[in-house]
A protein has these predicted regions:
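Long, low-complexity or tandemly repetitive, helically biased scaffold regions used
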Residues: 2-91
Length: 91
């Protein structure tokens, strides 16, 4: 591998790491929103929890949680891929 290609790879790895940091920030914000929605549902009286609006809030909280899990997994996979690239380049 020549210096020019190595520099390009390092630049792209840095860009990917920056994107991952942005995703982590977004993930934290989504987790905060999921917590807020779940707390909203949990603080409702049982009668309201069973209402259409209560069920909708619970569904939204669950959707946020599912999305958070998927995004977290994707971030972990991306970090692993970057580590593999760095190891290959530095051999």
């Amino acid at each position: 591998m020549n210096k020019q290609r190595r520099a390009k790879i390092e630049s792209e790895v840095l860009a990917a790491q920056t994107a991952i940091e942005a995703l982590r920030f977004a993930l934290q914000n989504l987790q905060d929103l999921a917590t807020e929605e779940q707390e909203c549902f949990d603080n409702m009286p049982e009668g309201l929890q069973a209402s259409e609006n209560g069920q909708r809030i619970e569904e939204i909280a669950q959707a946020f949680e599912s999305a958070n899990d998927s995004l977290s997994s994707a971030i972990d996979d991306a970090e692993s891929a970057i580590e593999e690239i760095e190891e290959a380049v530095n051999q």
